[in-house]
Amino acid sequence: MKKKIGGILLDGRTMKKFFTVLFVSFIFMSGAFAQVSVDPDDTFYSLVESWELRGLINEVPPLRPYPIANIRDILQTVIEKGNDRDVRNAKMYWEKVTGKPWNVSAEVGAMYRKNAETSDFGEILFSLFPSVNGDITLFDSFVSMGYDLGLASYNHDIQDYLAVFENDGHDARRNKVALGDLNVFLEMNDVLAIGKKNIFVQTGIYRSGYGPFINAGLSLNDNSYHRTNLSFTTVNPKWSYTQQYSAIGATKSFDGGFIAPDKYLAFHALEFKFIPQFSFSYYESIVFGKRLDPSYLMPVPYIVAQEIGGYNDNLQMGLAFKVRPYSGLLWATDVFVDDFNIAGFFENGLLNTRFFTAVKTGLIYTPADSFCTRISLDYTMLMPYTYTHADYVDTTTGTISSGMYNYLNYTNNGIPMGSSYPPNSDRLSFELDFIPIPPLHIKVLSTFLRHGNINESISDDEAIAYLRSDYGTYSTDGGINNHPLMSNPSGTAGTAIASSNSLNFLTQDNLMYVLQEGIGAEYSLKKYSWGQLSFSVSYLFEWIRNKGVDTDMFPGKGSAIIDKGNGTYEYDHEDYSGSDLVSLFRNAWKAGLSNEINNYFSIGLKYQF
């Protein structure tokens, strides 16, 4: 006998397996109510932003999430110094972090994506996130552990229901268990913290975020995939320092598929707070693999430590500053430098030099006592090839081959660790947060993004080199896997294509344009002895012009393209000049572009006991 549950057809044996997993997940397992000490995306950190901008608190750790000792100290300060609205929010979180050390939670959700040109209703994505989560503290919070242990379950691929360039909010990506049409993923995060509020160590498996732009950082993005982290932080009135060493996942260099171990990220940042209205930060990150390197655990400049290993790792540097000209108002800027040819800049100018850089600047305003709790306006630009990096078969050769893993690009499990937008993009974003009544939280957003495939700007010779390579060697989709280096077996590093020495920022003929307008709301009922219920609903309108820009333009054809000499090539039993062959593939890529309008709907019910 077979029975349908939420549109999923299950036979008797599978039903028994389904309910067994469901029962176990309620007892032991994460997803719905992530803990403040585990999840850097929790609303708590937006509240901290407001409290800091208005001068209620002065010293917060540079890395999110915070240890329980810091969270409690922040909440106590706000309860003592804040207005009625601040106190109400702080007390709500105080109950969470000082309550019982475990909570059983579950979230049931439904998502629907509707293409405006499609007449049928389409299929609904049903999701279930059962969990156990909580905080454990010892020795007056000198030792604390936050945990969020559970399952993420879907009846369809979640990637098909996300807006363009959006990261999934859950760490459920691989090693699924199929129960009929239901895909179940293990999802666990935990953070162990040891120390006092001004100096501490954290370790565990969790997402981490850095910088003034929550969920949109250029170096460590709060909504990127989780990592195994070990960090040290010290927070002082005039300066702070943090250092994090992370184990991450390497994926195929061509498309970010599959996964392999032995890839690492090291990050550290030093912030100076000269006056209450101004702070300045310098940070470095470095990606490396196939070895453990203790030199990146030391508080020394990575640009110096890298020299010991021969400059084979992927180093980035950044500068950030925050200006608070008025209570509740912040102007923040973050400059992330991946690769910048300084000599070329002075010799040839900015338009004719290698400049792999990301910049984000914006204004954030958090009124003191208003139902509008946050207003933000920011602009982001990512130059071509930012975050990309080639890897080689081994450290003795510049050979790049089909199917190899990349241990050097700025991804974890194939997901960008910085901005979620691809290189050669810019984005303007406006957001509003409202709390008209305390249990109701409303968020409104409006964004406009442009993206170009850098391969529209390369030369015919460079395009032919891509086409004549083996399939799976080079990506030409203009994304984070599309680096500018070609294989160089006779050297120790690849050869950069000449076009990468020109800026070419959004100068392509066929740009992708994305407009998004959205609204979401969440309402929580009063907490009772039997638990608490929360409801959420959201809608997003998305307009895309030239969808498909981010697809391969010059896929490798290997021996299918024959060089007949004199600038003539044979492909598919036809002869072409070099320029005609390039035009053939470029025109095929252009023919695949389309305009699209999408509507995204989601509803959710959360329960916590």
Regions found by a protein language model. Name each.
Residues A32-A34:
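Boundary at the C-terminal end of the N-terminal hydrophobic targeting segment
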Residues K2-K4, G12-F18:
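Positively charged n-region of N-terminal signal peptides that target proteins for export
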Residues T20-S30:
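Bacterial N-terminal signal peptides
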Residues D39-D42, R54-P62, Y66-S279, K290, ...:
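Outer-membrane beta-barrel channel domains
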Residues F274, F278-I286, R291-F609:
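Exposed, low-structure sequence patches enriched in small/polar residues
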